[in-house]
Swiss-Prot record:
It is found in: Cytoplasm. This is 3-dehydroquinate synthase. It holds the Pfam family DHQS_C. It comes from the Bacteria. Catalyzes the conversion of 3-deoxy-D-arabino-heptulosonate 7-phosphate (DAHP) to dehydroquinate (DHQ). Pathway: Metabolic intermediate biosynthesis; chorismate biosynthesis; chorismate from D-erythrose 4-phosphate and phosphoenolpyruvate: step 2/7.
Amino acid sequence: MHVTTIFDTVPVNGASPYEVVIGSGLTPLIAERAAGSGATQVALLHQPALAEVAADIDGALQAAGLQVLHLEVPDAESGKTLAVAGECWDKLGAAAFGRRDIIIGLGGGAATDLAGFVAAAWMRGVRVIQVPTTVLGMVDAAVGGKTGINTAAGKNLVGAFHEPDAVFIDLDRLHTLPDEEIIAGSAEIIKTGFIADEEILRLYESDASACLQREIDGSHLPELIARSVRVKGSVVSADLKESNLREILNYGHTFAHAVELREDFQWRHGNAVAVGMMFIANLSYNLGLIDADLLERHRVILDSIGLPTTYQGGVFDELYEGMTRDKKNRDGNIRFVALTAVGEVTRIEGPDRGELIRAYEAISS
């Protein structure tokens, strides 16, 4: 049996405080938390590739006296649809799933987003425990209470704020991930470095390979995950519903979401965020907000772990249309989260279209 080891615990305060537990061998703690919630049933939402992991958690839940209902959903963004959510609700209804019962979201960011949305809507809100299994899910999607599904109009335009009961980040799951998943998820970690924690950037600059290493000994990844979660936890504790401060977590995301829409959600989110950060860094440089060194620092760090720094997949007009749909926009103006220095965030509102074209040309040539 794998020994349970806790690496760090990050509190997320606010209206409904919870903890993010980071460690290894956490399945017993997941079952203990669910059993202590007063639930009689647990709905375990997961993707087909995680059937074996789900079976392990199922066994622990049943040993704790809980009935387990499996909600197997399609992989990645294809599972984040109203149709899939509807199928989940139908199964909950057939099982007489009650208000005291609990949903567990097991998987990457798409699975935890969907689990949170299904939980938020069922009986106007039941509890959810998030168990992210990808780097992206660990540092971004599973923390903060944002849930959602995709529609033809765009990504995450339908959703709800629904804070989890707890988040368990089991570092053992890193061993199951392909290299490209760890690389793509690292874009969100790097993002938090630029907006709030320069030590994250220094770790990548000191030894990029250690930042991707799965084995705990000698790896920077556990510390990077913990630091990134701590940044996000601090931000969402102060601003759950994205009224102001939480917007800083969208650094690089305005252009990223346009890319994802253009690519019909077939691009990895982290890769889109990487080119999104390069886009806003170039725009900020052209507007005199940052210097050439900070612009180059973006490129060097992203490139050091194999993240894309250019994008040639669409004409500007298509991407511009995607940016006009961004949730941060106000009064018809496209709004960008930008930097003036590492850890110093500002906003760019309604920039000249010519400047946007110039920034796009810099990353598409």
